[in-house]
Each structure stands twice: as C-alpha cells, then as structure tokens.
C-alpha cells in the first residue's frame, strides 16, 4: 500500500510506522505517558487505510480511531488530541510571524498588526501549549476558527 507524504513523496506504508507515530506521541518526554495501546490503535487504523492515502489523512483517521476508544480508557481522548494538534502543527509554519505573513498576503491580517508581530510576538509562542486543549476543543477550533496557517496559539 502506498502513502503520500506531506512533501508529495509516495512511499510504502508500513504498520510499524503508524505504531511508531502513535507511540511517539505517547512517550515523548514533554508528555505524560498515557495508558493506551498503540498497536491496537494502529491495527484499527490500518484496516481503514487505502492506497494513496495522505499522511495527514492517516493522522485524522488515527485521531478518530483513538477517540472511538475513549470508553476503554479516557487517555484515548488525550491521544486523539495529541495526534490532531501534531497534524495541525505539521501543516502550519513553525514560526508565528511566518504564519501571519501568509495570512497577511491573503488580506486576513493588517499592516499595523504585522508591525507589532515583528517587534513582539514570536517569543511568546510555546508550541507545547497547543497540547493543553482537549480533543473536542481542538477539533472545534480546527473546524470553525483556525485559518489554514494557524495553530491554536496562533489564533
């Protein structure tokens, strides 16, 4: 089965890659370890995958599978949130001012605001704070409020 990466490269999908992504979001030093089973989530995700699926779609599918497992353990909600936030962060510029420049180019952000951003705001952003939301809060922001270049903190 082939997967389309964010870069546009097409690669072979391996079960271990899905498991590794889930495990990483469970075991990173900045995160509290969750009582979840990455293999079990990955198995459910793998059964719903199709040839040509994008890595972003895999993340969305993985989050949906994790949230469906919330009745087994509430930690699956936290895992779903981490997957969703990580996916959002991967699609947005790493720097707040770069995200605002992209929005400025589309007429969403004013010239005055851009001047202020360059002077003050980049240092205020801590990407780890994006993970302070719950899954449903992140999904609400993603579907109703965030522009394509924004993480929850950029809003």
What annotation goes with each model-predicted range?
Residues 1-155:
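Extended catalytic cores of very large enzyme megasubunits
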